[in-house]
Every structure is written in structure tokens, then in C-alpha cells.
Design a protein with these regions (language model features):
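Structural motif
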Residues: 6, 110-114, 141, 172
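Glycine-rich phosphate-binding P-loop
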Residues: 6-23
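N-terminal phosphate/diphosphate-binding loop that engages ATP/GTP or pyrophosphate donors
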Residues: 18-90, 94, 99-103
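Short internal beta-strands
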Residues: 38, 141-144, 169-174
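Switch II (G3) loop of P-loop NTPases
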Residues: 96-125
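Inter-motif core of Ras-like GTPase G domains
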Residues: 124-147
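C-terminal lobe/tail of nucleotide-utilizing enzymes
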Residues: 158-224
């Protein structure tokens, strides 16, 4: 039976893609087949490719087309709903859900759905990316960017996930830059206050590698 996880972040730039790739590397090391989808990405090169989506493709074991991994690729590196408006496109949660289900029907048995920005990123005036996770009814893995303000951001996000009726399955402490002051104290507070197990504390890796990052994660209960 396949397992699907929605990877959310406490903010933009906290390392959702890096951790998504590390999760897949850890899962594939146990023999699982992995796949990922980033249904909406804002910020593409001249060929219409998004760097995060390309990283996901490199990390997964399944051979999926780019259009499956990143079906909505928006040129401008700004909030998705604004980028969509500039591109003359309309984003709808129901359509994004259908695109995600397409990947969920693949041969992979460990699937990652990566969000964009934080939990409440709008996709239109009425819906956010959280609505995609809610309609899919999948567990959420929260990436906490270990920097000043992370405790407040993490607790607010966990509360929002709970109020949306979803399970915060686990969280990952990720260092997107040099180690923050009082790192261990912040980490211990998060351990005590977040209502989910911590999968690991991933250090800042200047020469980032998914396999190396995976060594800092314990994903056994996600893959059982």
C-alpha cells in the first residue's frame, strides 16, 4: 500500500524541497519506490522549468514527466495566486487535487506532495494550498526552518493544520543557513510543544546532498 505525505513549511525558504528529497532518499534506501509532485511552482527558467521540481525529479526513483511533477509552472517568483493572475491562469484546489491523484496512482509506494511557501498560501481569493491537502486527506510533515521566530511559526502552523482537520504526522528541524543562536534550546522547546514526533535535525549543508541529509532522518514509522 502506498503512503502519501504533504510536506508543508513554516515559511518560504525553510527547505521544503531539500527535506522532500531527503525523505525520498531515506525511503528509497529501505527499498521503497518514490515519487513527488509540486503541483504549483512559482519561479521558472527560460525553458519553463522550476529548480525545486527538477530537484524532486532527480531524487525520486520513478520516471515521471516534468509535467506530472510540476503541472502548474508559473514564470514569476512571487506568490502563486499573483503569478497565476499575471500569466492569465486560474488556480483551483479541485484541479490541483486531481493532478496529485494522478501521481498517487503511479507505481510508487512513498509519495511526497510539496506545497509552496507556508500553510496558508492563497491560490485564489477563496482557497489556499491547504485546501489541497484537506481534500486529499493526507498526513502532513512540517518542515521547521530553524531560525529566529521558528517556534511561533511552527506552533501557529501546527494549530492551523489541526483546525483544518488534518494530522500533523511528523516534523523536521531543518537548518537553511548557519546554525542559529541557542539552537538546542529552540529545538527542545519545539520537541515539547509540537504534537508530533520529530524525524530529525538536519544541519546546514553548504554542498547539499539528499543522501547525506537523509542520514539525519529517521523515517521508519513513515514507511511501515
Amino acid at each position: 500500500m502506498s503512503k502519501t505525505w504533504f510536506v508543508a513549511g513554516t515559511d518560504t525558504g525553510v527547505g521544503k524541497t531539500a527535506i522532500s528529497c531527503a525523505l525520498m532518499a531515506a525511503a528509497s534506501a529501505t527499498g521503497l519506490r518514490t515519487a513527488a509532485i509540486k503541483p504549483v511552482a512559482a519561479g521558472c527558467d527560460d525553458n519553463g522549468y522550476n529548480d525545486d521540481a527538477l530537484c524532486l525529479m532527480e531524487a525520486m526513483t520513478e520516471d515521471l514527466e516534468y509535467s506530472q511533477v510540476n503541472p502548474v509552472a508559473l514564470e514569476a517568483a512571487i506568490a502563486p495566486h499573483i503569478a497565476a493572475n499575471l500569466a492569465g491562469k486560474t488556480l483551483q484546489a479541485s484541479r490541483l487535487v486531481g493532478l496529485c491523484r494522478g501521481v498517487m496512482l503511479s507505481q510508487a509506494n512513498f509519495i511526497v506532495i510539496e506545497g509552496a511557501g507556508g500553510w496558508r498560501v492563497p491560490i485564489n481569493p477563496r482557497e489556499t494550498l491547504a485546501d489541497v491537502a484537506v481534500q486529499l486527506q493526507v498526513g502532513v510533515i512540517l518542515v521547521v526552518g530553524m531560525r529566529l521566530g521558528c517556534i511561533n511559526h511552527a506552533l501557529l502552523t501546527a494549530e492551523a493544520i489541526r483546525r483544518d482537520g488534518l494530522q500533523l504526522a511528523a516534523w523536521v528541524a531543518n537548518q537553511p543557513g548557519p546554525r542559529m543562536a541557542c539552537h538546542e534550546e529552540n529545538l527542545e522547546t519545539l520537541r515539547q510543544m509540537l504534537p508530533a514526533p520529530m524525524l530529525g535535525d538536519v544541519p546546514y549543508l553548504p554542498d547539499w546532498d539528499a543522501t547525506e541529509a537523509a542520514n539525519h532522518l529517521d523515517v521508519h514509522f513513515l514507511t511501515e
